[in-house]
Amino acid sequence: MSVSEMPRRRGPRRALTEDEILDAALDLLDEGGPDAASIRGIAARVGVAPNAVYTYFPDKAAVVSGLVERLLGGVDHDVFADPERPWRERVEALALELRAHLSAHPGAVPLMIGGPMDGPHALTLNERLLELLGDAGLDPTDAARAAYLLIVYVFGSIALEVADVHRPGPLPPEAERVADRQAAFSAAPSDQFPRSAQASATMAAYVSTEQYLWGLHRILSGITAREATSDGPEPAETHGRTGLREAHSA
């Protein structure tokens, strides 16, 4: 048998872990945005065949679920765990921590809100939020509704901030993003959009921390007001029902 006919020995199999796969996926998302982390792309990044990735994650959705858990698991619970701090300060600390942590990986944010967040780290964060709202005096039902409202606001705000930047990679500094938005609004004809022109500086700052906290504080004040008036129906709900009845009778 000639040397060329001899069977080739296979090299040692590449060792692989779930953490390596998730690291590679997050790197690809950071570099190329939400479409960059395909199974083939992840496999190429870690130097294995796609089948090796499928051994740990059956599809991209499973990789995304793992990434969601990875990112939520990196949230610092100490910033809102101190029971001696007022509950509003603790909710604000959680909201700011989530914004800072997730905005560091803008390519992952659209994937996070595109599917369920129901892993252990997500459930733990939800439990902590329910505890905070319970400390505010809300009953379990209102605490759950308020928690959902806060989750929608926090993740929705982060998603809109990320979507405002039309290129992959890390978010530019806040001042740069606000300036870019101001330039875009200034280019719009003020005779067609006079109110927008008047409010352009405020609208440009929609992506600012100041705006984020402004909205959060209004929500927290609304939650507090709802608790203070929980013995009777909410005026807005009463108006809505009355208006419908009057419209129907007319």
Can you name each region flagged by the protein language model?
Residues E20, A24, L28-A62, G66:
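Helix-turn-helix
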Residues S186-M203, V207-W214, R218:
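Non-DNA-binding regulatory cores of transcription-related proteins
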Residues L125-L149, V154-Q182, A204, I223-R226:
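Hydrophobic alpha-helical bundle segments that form small-molecule/ligand-binding pockets
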Residues E20, A62, A93, T124, ...:
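Amphipathic alpha-helical interaction segments
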Residues H77-T124, P140-T141, A147-L150:
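Hydrophobic alpha-helical connector segments
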Residues I21-L29, L67, L71, L98, ...:
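Short hydrophobic clusters on alpha-helical segments that form packing/core surfaces
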Residues M1-L16, F80-P83, D191-T202, D231-A250:
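N-terminal intrinsically disordered/low-complexity leader segments
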